[in-house]
Structures are given as structure tokens and as C-alpha cells.
């Protein structure tokens, strides 16, 4: 086996593939990156949960396959000079040469490496930038408690040309709808995807114009052929990744979103975000930021008489009876930074019920905003 490849292309592919390497592999070969040379160089990794594979152009007259330490290969390729990279298999060792630098790496038996799962049939495609932004908006609200695995996922619902993404950790709920290009106009499916894996995948597949989404539900065509478990795959820009779906029943989130409100505030997103950041500097762990809305303004407060305190007043448009409400400052900031509008709209029912944070629709558009962030308030003393 012998090949030559561009240094930057190789380094990017290896770094991307190494993301899927397990931190504590159950068997040594899972710490490896597999390199297979044929018409192209395929660089892959797999930990039985997530697979990653990148295809890149290569010059070769000796095809073959090798398996080397993934993290070591990533560190080496990242530090190489800007020269073509030559790599060959010599007995049980891989020799990598770039400029005047030569590295000799121990290989692992490729026959012990698991077979990568096949990509399910494509369900449709969506623009990479749109998809990455939508996933980032929603993944922020996913739970991080592995004892509640259902809440660590993002619910993906496909209905024709619309995808709905939703996540919740019980304290907030993020929902985003976006248009896409389905493979069939009548496609209808739902899946629960690990949030961290989905967010990482969406961020890393932006090199192409579109990302193809391939969903294989349990017991249906496209499921993992080895286990029968549900699986989803993403492909774009010469890169492919798959992950197993989470089991469990996601909360019926649509019933949590109110249709009618008693008060609505509108504020400049950037100024409001900065105000929350400043005021929350004095908020100790789990201490809320208090918001008092009245005609023409909102007063932000944090801290108590026995601690450091902060107060700031910000101009705001407000329609409804005066309201005082308190939020976890980090959860509030997570929602505000996900808003892609210059103006933030906060809609209230009563102070004890969740508020809904959205961007202000352009003009007088009455349509439902494509992103909604529902945030539970913290009960105020007294």
C-alpha cells in the first residue's frame, strides 16, 4: 500500500474523523483510524455508536488498507509542513513522509476492526448553513443528565417538506421548524438523535452546499443491518457519518406551547443580551435575574440586600399588565443568543407559567415564528 495526498486535505479529514474516536475504547482497535486506498482514500472511525468516514482524492498505484492510532495520526498530520504527504505500509508499520519529516507508526490488525454500518437510503436534503444554525438553536436546550437519556436527544419530526427539531431539559424547550427537500413529498417520520452528536455533525458538515439526511427507523429498511436498531446518517462534502437513535418516548412538546398570551414585550436583542450578561455578574449560583416589565421599559435586577446587587433599566415595548418574572440567567442567555432577529419578543401568560421567547417577525407577518424558546420562570420569594 502506497499513496500521496495533499497535506491540508489529509489533516482536515483525519481531524474530522477523529471526532468519533471513543475516549475509552472497549477494545484497542476502536482507538484507530482506518485508511483504505482505492480510487480514493477513505479515512474512517467507528465506536459502535457513531461512525465517521471522509473520502479524499489521492494518487496511488498500490491500493490497500491500514489501521493506526487515530489521535496520534491527528496530532501528526496537524503539525506537518505544507508539502505533499506520502504514506506506505511496510510490514507491520506505516511510514509517513512529508518534506524532511518521517514518522513510523505501529499498525493494528485491520481484520479486527468492525465493519462500518451502511448509510440508510436518503430521506432528503437541506442547506448546510441552515441546518447547522437550526441544530445549534435547538441543541442548547437538550438535557445533559445521562440518567434521563430521552432528554439528552433532539426530536426530529419530518412531515413532507418541513422538519421540526425539538429538545428539552424540563426547564426550557427549544423548537425550530425549517423547510427542506424531501426525497418523497409524502415522507413522514420521527426520530430521537443524541444532541451532542447531532450538534457536532451539523457544525462539521458545512463544507458542501447541502447535507443529505438518511433515516432508518428500527425494523425498517435502512436500520442497522447488524442490530436492527434505528440509525440516522448525514452526508455532505465528501463526508459521511451515522449514529444510532435513542430509544424512549419524547415529551409531547407541542401541548406545552401556549397559543394565547396576556402580555408581550419587545426589546433590541443585542442590548437586552448585554444587559442580562452585566446584571447576572452578581448572581450567585442558581440565583435568578429578575425582570420587571412595565410600559416602555424593563428593569433587570440580580442579587439581594445581603449580597452584591445590580440594577439596569432598558427601553422596551410592552403591551399588557405590569409583570415581574425571574429566570435562570444562563438559560435566558442561551435563548437570547439563539435568536436570529434584531428584536426579541417575549410573550407571557402569567408570572408562574413559562414565557415564550422568539424573534420578532419581519413586517406584520402573522405566521408562527420558526424558532420558539419556552423558558420556565423561577418562583420569586414572597
Predicted regions and their residues:
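Structural preference for solvent-exposed beta-strand-turn elements
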Residues: 1-382
Amino acid at each position: 500500500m502506497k499513496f500521496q495526498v495533499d497535506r491540508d486535505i489529509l489533516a482536515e479529514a483525519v481531524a474530522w474523523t477523529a471526532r468519533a474516536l471513543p475516549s475509552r475504547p472497549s477494545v484497542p482497535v476502536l482507538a484507530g483510524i482506518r485508511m483504505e486506498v482505492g480510487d480514493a482514500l477513505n479515512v474512517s472511525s467507528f465506536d459502535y455508536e457513531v461512525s465517521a468516514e471522509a473520502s479524499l482524492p489521492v494518487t496511488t498505484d498500490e491500493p490497500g488498507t491500514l489501521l493506526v492510532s487515530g489521535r496520534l495520526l491527528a496530532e501528526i498530520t496537524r503539525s506537518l509542513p505544507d508539502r505533499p504527504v506520502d504514506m506506505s505500509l511496510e510490514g507491520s508499520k506505516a511510514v509517513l513522509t512529508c518534506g524532511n519529516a518521517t514518522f513510523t507508526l505501529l499498525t493494528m490488525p485491520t481484520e479486527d476492526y468492525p465493519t462500518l454500518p451502511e448509510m440508510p437510503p436518503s430521506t432528503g436534503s437541506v442547506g448546510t448553513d441552515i441546518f447547522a444554525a437550526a441544530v445549534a438553536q435547538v441543541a442548547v436546550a437538550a438535557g445533559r443528565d445521562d440518567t434521563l437519556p430521552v432528554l439528552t436527544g433532539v426530536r426530529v419530526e419530518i412531515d413532507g417538506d418541513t422538519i421540526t427539531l425539538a429538545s428539552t431539559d424540563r426547564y426550557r424547550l427549544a423548537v425550530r421548524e425549517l423547510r427542506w427537500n424531501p426525497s418523497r413529498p409524502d415522507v413522514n417520520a420521527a426520530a430521537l438523535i443524541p444532541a451532542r452528536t447531532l450538534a457536532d455533525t451539523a457544525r462539521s458538515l458545512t463544507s458542501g452546499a447541502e447535507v443529505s439526511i438518511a433515516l432508518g427507523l428500527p425494523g425498517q429498511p435502512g436500520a442497522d443491518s447488524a442490530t436492527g436498531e434505528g440509525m440516522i446518517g448525514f452526508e455532505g462534502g465528501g463526508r459521511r457519518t451515522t449514529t444510532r437513535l435513542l430509544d424512549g418516548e419524547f415529551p409531547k412538546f407541542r401541548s406545552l406551547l401556549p397559543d394565547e398570551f396576556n402580555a408581550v414585550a419587545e426589546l433590541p436583542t443585542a442590548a437586552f443580551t448585554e444587559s442580562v450578561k452585566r446584571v447576572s455578574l452578581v448572581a450567585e449560583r442558581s440565583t435568578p435575574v429578575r425582570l420587571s416589565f412595565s410600559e416602555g421599559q424593563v428593569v433587570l435586577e440580580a442579587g439581594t440586600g445581603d449580597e452584591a446587587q445590580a440594577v439596569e433599566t432598558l427601553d422596551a415595548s410592552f403591551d399588557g399588565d405590569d409583570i415581574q418574572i425571574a429566570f435562570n440567567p444562563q438559560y435566558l442567555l442561551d435563548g437570547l443568543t439563539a435568536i436570529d432577529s434584531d428584536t426579541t419578543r417575549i410573550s407571557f401568560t402569567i408570572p408562574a407559567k413559562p414565557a415564550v421567547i422568539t424573534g420578532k417577525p419581519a413586517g406584520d407577518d402573522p405566521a408562527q415564528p420558526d424558532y420558539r424558546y419556552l423558558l420556565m420562570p423561577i418562583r420569586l420569594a414572597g
